[in-house]
Swiss-Prot record:
One of its GO terms (molecular function) is rRNA binding. This is Small ribosomal subunit protein uS3. PANTHER family: 30S/40S RIBOSOMAL PROTEIN S3, SMALL RIBOSOMAL SUBUNIT PROTEIN US3C. NCBIfam families: rpsC_bact. Belongs to the universal ribosomal protein uS3 family. Part of the 30S ribosomal subunit. Forms a tight complex with proteins S10 and S14. The gene is rpsC. PROSITE patterns: KH_TYPE_2, RIBOSOMAL_S3. GO terms for biological process: translation. It comes from the Bacteria. Keywords: Ribonucleoprotein, Ribosomal protein, RNA-binding, rRNA-binding.
Amino acid sequence: MGNKVNPIGMRLQVNRTWDSRWYADTKDYGDLLLEDLAIRDFIKKECHQAGVARVIIERPHKKCRVTIHTARPGVIIGKKGADIEGLRQKIAKMTASELHLNIVEVRKPELDAALVGESIAQQLERRVSFRRAMKRAVQNAMRMGALGIRVNVAGRLGGAEIARTEWYREGRVPLHTLRADIDYAHVEAATAYGIIGIKTWIFKGEIMEHDPAARDRKAQELQDGPAPRGAGGRR
């Protein structure tokens, strides 16, 4: 079962929480959900050069708080904050609530599944060998402290006539262990021969406490540096 389902959805409320954090009545739920999807699609399209990893949307009373996790915050902020102000005005037109826009830097993009997948996709679109791109991503993740990583690519690899799937794994990726902190992402690369799907799993360690915010705390620990042995769960 753990090998088939989405690792993030399987671990919601165990060691990870939702990216949309709000409650709405039945009559408003559909409109707010469509608004969330529109905001996410717009941000990923508008800021595709900034390496957007996650977009978290919270809705306290009559407000909309959007937090963008990015590997290159300077690209979004721009010179003297000009670009982020323009982005804020565009997003504000998509919602009737008061908008608050926050930018959070991803200090270790090599440990973020979405950013690793985007990097591989960009290399494939530049005609880099898929084996070289996969191996480079795996080596960088392990060098930065990941305990395990798996990368799958599927499609007309290298321009082959018949589509196939190739994968590369290093370390442990325990998909059946609920306390395992596993980041997952699916990205598509638009090559001259067609679409190539890229799936990335990154195992960062085990989270022992059952708290929706535990995953965010663990991610912050990884960004700040490795903890000494014996200071928490298994390393």
